[in-house]
Amino acid sequence: APRLPQCQGDDQEKCLCNKDECPPGQCRFPRGDADPYCE
């Protein structure tokens, strides 16, 4: 699967992230080994 780009600023597209890089409630943590992403 293609890797998602890293979060940058207020980018609203799906991207790799941590809870400090996304608006509250917008960071998704998929099951398994998938990386979290903004949504």
UniProtKB/Swiss-Prot annotation:
GO molecular function: enzyme inhibitor activity
Position of sequence motif Cell attachment site: 31-33
Sequence similarity: Belongs to the ornatin family.
Compartment(s): Secreted
GO biological process: cell adhesion
Highest rank taxon of the organism: Eukaryota
Transmembrane residue ranges: none
Annotated GO CC locations: extracellular region
Originating species: Macrobdella decora
Primary location recorded for the protein, binned into one broad class: secreted
Entry keywords, A to Z: Cell adhesion, Secreted
Function description: Inhibits fibrinogen interaction with platelet receptors expressed on glycoprotein IIb-IIIa complex. May prevent blood from clotting during either feeding and/or storage of ingested blood.
Name of the molecule in the record: Decorsin
Region (High affinity binding domain) location: 27-38
SUPFAM superfamilies per record: Leech antihemostatic proteins
